[in-house]
Swiss-Prot record:
UniProt entry tagged with the keyword Metal-binding: yes
Sample GO molecular function, one term: nucleotide binding
Domain Guanylate cyclase: 97-236
Gene field: pycC
Listed name of the protein: Cytidylate cyclase
Species this chain originates from: Escherichia coli
Written domain comment of the UniProt record: Has an N-terminal nucleotide cyclase domain and a C-terminal nucleotide sensor domain (AGS-C); removal of the latter leads to loss of phage P1 and T5 resistance.
Amino acid sequence: MSFKDVTAKNFKGLKNVSLKKSMAMEGHTLVGTEARLGDAFELCESFSTSPSNIIEYEYQEEIRPFFQKAGLNKHSIGTHPELTGLGVGMIYNQYTVTMFVDIRKSSRLSLLLPLEQVYVVKNRILQACIDIVRALDGYPHRLMGDALMAFFGRSDVSKEDAIADAINAASTLRLILMDYIFPSLNEDIGEQIDLGVRIGLDYGAEDEVVWGNFGLGSFCEVTALGLPVDMTAKLQQLADKNTAMLGQGILDYIDFPEEYTKPKVKSGEELKYIIPNITNKEGQPINRRIRLLNMARYQELLPFKLNDKKMASAILYPNQFNFECFVIEDNKEVLYNSVSRFLPKKRRLTFKLSIYPGPGIGDLKIIFCKRNHGQEAKDDLSEDYSISIEDNKLIRVKNADNLSLLRKDGCYVLTVPEETLFRGLHTMEVIVRGNHETLFYRNIIGVYIK
């Protein structure tokens, strides 16, 4: 199933909502207060292709295999699963990655639809956001109107992997909302609603984050406290429409490459620090850095099918080539899906381009573009390997002594050996052209290294 199919099952026909009266609910007298609901209404959604409720876990079932995550994340909204036993007055230091997601211009729905339909549409969007966050091992914490707060990370997950999960969740949210859900709603409602999404992300270490049980008596909530957590809502507010704002905690901890970010520009000037730029106890501004995630560039790194991440339309033969990365673990070749997790240093990698012969696939010109980023890479930042294949024979053109071409199971496999050396995010891109420089295929794999 594709993202398009899942969205069609869950969002087509949202405009067709009828009402029927439900049984009146009896009121209950509380201390000093009388509560009575009277006549409630049950929404009966008449969908052309889906049942009355979103098919829970369908986005998860589509997304998780691409990130090599087993099973489903069935955690309910609320307390982080490791902290359910935290009593009132207790605190606990635990790192976390905090996410705030806000759906922009959703208030306009109230001007276009009856409120009953507005409820259904907004609820469906939030349900999808919850499932996408859970697909990347996030823990939805709280709903606030048309916004969602979530946490990533736990004691048995590395900090690096939690950050990668959060960034991947932000990029996947943007992809599915902007390219699938919002267009489906526009078509169904018959209006260009101009919905958008803004996301804030930041990481806080153990000494920066305290979890506590806040509240009184039965009115309690276990949540996180600390500057990185508190600032994430402000990051979301500063994010441009349809992108995510990354906080200093993420930028610094994994040495996230500037090439995959953009500056925040306000009134023609770059905004380098989160605003308001609060001061510390010495009265000095904290100057907490911010950068926008470059969604267009990072989206290309997601391990989804080319059609799903909107790359197939620019290439001629998306289905006659396949680009993969393998890591050697315990003397075995293990598939590593792009940006799916952080790898240790000193691991051998093999990039493989499979070429499936077919009509139109003749002689080829192939370039592998390696790009390292970050402080550890320093001068070792980029290298290109160029080869051509003529009459099914490999011709090495540039820096290609280590490349090899094998015939296997009816296809040709071109291999490029590499190694994990530098901390951060690094990429290998392949570009395949035919005669007259026609673009046959292009794909890119991101490798996170601890």
